[in-house]
A protein has these predicted regions:
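Glycine-rich adenosine-cofactor-binding loop
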Residues: 7, 89-94, 101-102, 106, ...
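Rossmann-like adenosine-cofactor binding region
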Residues: 148-216, 337-343
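Adenosine-phosphate binding glycine-rich loop
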Residues: 31, 195-258, 399
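A glycine- and Lys/Arg-enriched "phosphate-lid" helix/loop adjacent to the NTP-binding pocket
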Residues: 349-388, 395
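Phosphate/diphosphate ligand-binding glycine-rich loop within oxidoreductases
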Residues: 2-104, 199-201, 205-207, 211-217, ...
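NTP-dependent small-molecule kinase module
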Residues: 244-256, 276, 280, 326, ...
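ATP-dependent small-molecule kinase phosphotransfer cores
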Residues: 290-348
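NAD(P)-binding Rossmann-fold cofactor-contacting core
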Residues: 131-149, 289-291, 295-296
């Protein structure tokens, strides 16, 4: 192996995609489940340069002949370069986190900062916060140690902090939807930063957005940035414009991996348009109504007849949560998916949402749709749901002409979203 990543579990890593997109060299994922395997790998030194992830960022320091002062102070190495058999260790997580905060205007000067978690990434983010002038850095733990001044999550809410940084795995794929801090009860917050990058927006970030926190950002750009700075060490050269490379690759990753969810009234064209979009964009097409029927074994009219709308909505929420946390899908949603806030969080956590807007006069009446029994019912429904569709959507796609027109409008909307 020339270049690659070592760690205990690498199943969901984006590092291979990032490095090969960045520099074109072959980048291998090398899972080493045990410490014994990691030590054997490092002893052999059969690589040019590697990245290191949990749980080996401290262990690798034992094998380094040189450790960058910043990495030594943090107590973790995530980038190792083999120079004629001698290993040189660096910490580009620091650089990646600093870039993320700078790029999104997080101002640490004079601020009180809460860091959720006590693991290795705590030290990295704490170093950045202190170096950028934070007045106070507080640590939050589920099991706080009073002797070290750690806070509980309940105490953290009352801390008066302006900045929150999550370094725990709370909300990380596949265990999404977890949020341990009540950010809505912290009115003075200026920024919430989560180092988790899958999903794109954790529950913490989604709730921060809902609470109106000015800056709420996940960790994907940090991941890309640390890879760019690691590649500079790998190749012993600087990129002419590293921030531009980081923006380019972050946008490309989102374009490649994020789900696209279509919302709108029944018979507005979500399924037909969705299948065309899925084919054009290389996404797996999923009709959530079909997923409900497949999981339940009954038709939608039969579910409504037996359990009413509430019973159907509960099943809809289950399937939205199931598919919403995955990647590279085109989700055609039922017309009422916007009625539950938890559904919108599930769609936004790893995707962009398009409202397919078709005039109510052009919608189909009756058929297998229990709530679309007449044009009068459709008009009432449309009046109730239109504000919800608009509030939930990242963009509106008019479907008033040909299918080709709608497809073109959808692609233009996606280009604008991913390029912004």
């Amino acid at each position: 192996m020339e270049y690659g990543l070592i760690g205990a579990k690498l199943g969901h890593s984006y590092s291979k995609i990032i490095h090969e997109m960045l520099c074109g060299y072959k980048y291998d994922l090398c899972p080493l489940p045990t410490e014994e395997e990691a030590r054997a790998f490092l002893t052999k030194r059969q690589f040019r340069a590697i990245n290191v992830t949990i749980p080996y960022k401290k262990l690798v320091m034992e094998y380094c002949s040189y450790i960058d002062p910043r990495a030594k102070a943090i107590g973790a190495v995530n980038t190792v370069v083999n120079k004629n058999g001698l290993l040189y260790g660096y910490n580009t997580d620091y650089l990646g986190f600093a870039h993320l905060c700078d790029a999104h205007g997080v101002d640490f000067a004079g601020r009180t900062v809460l860091i959720l978690g006590t693991g290795g990434t705590h030290n990295t983010t704490s170093a950045v916060a202190r170096d950028k002038g934070a007045a106070k850095v507080l640590t939050v733990s589920r099991h706080p140690d009073p002797e070290t001044g750690e806070l509980s999550y309940a105490e953290a809410v009352r801390s008066g902090a302006q900045i929150v940084i999550n370094t725990t795995p709370a909300g990380m794929y596949p265990n999404v939807g977890v949020c341990n801090l009540d950010v809505a009860a912290m009115p003075g917050l200026e920024a919430v930063v989560d180092v988790v990058y899958n999903p794109d927006k954790t529950e913490l970030i989604l709730r921060a957005e809902e609470a109106g926190v000015p800056v709420a950002v996940g960790g994907l750009e940090m991941l890309v940035a640390q890879a760019v700075y690691a590649a500079e060490y790998f190749l012993d050269r600087k990129f002419e414009d590293a921030p531009a490379e980081i923006r380019r690759i972050t946008a490309a990753l989102r374009r490649d991996t994020l789900n696209i969810a279509l919302i709108g009234m029944p018979s507005s064209g979500k399924t037909t348009l969705g299948k065309l979009l899925a084919k054009q964009l290389g996404r797996t097409f999923v009709d959530l109504d079909d997923a409900i029927v497949k999981a339940d074994g009954r038709s939608i009219p039969d579910i409504f007849a037996a359990e009413g709308e509430d019973g159907f909505r509960a099943k809809e929420t289950e399937q939205t949560a199931r598919f919403g946390k995955e990647n590279r899908q085109l989700l055609s949603c039922g017309g009422g998916v916007v009625k539950r806030p938890e559904n919108l969080r599930a769609l936004h956590q790893n995707g962009v949402v398009l409202f397919i807007d078709r005039p109510v006069e052009a919608l189909a009446v009756g058929g297998s749709r229990p709530l679309s029994s007449s044009m009068a019912a459709l008009r009432t429904m449309e009046a109730q749901r239109r504000p919800l569709y608009r509030a939930a959507a990242d963009a509106v796609v008019p479907n008033t002409g040909t299918l080709e027109d709608a497809l073109r409008a959808a692609m233009e909307a996606l280009d604008e979203i991913f390029d912004s």
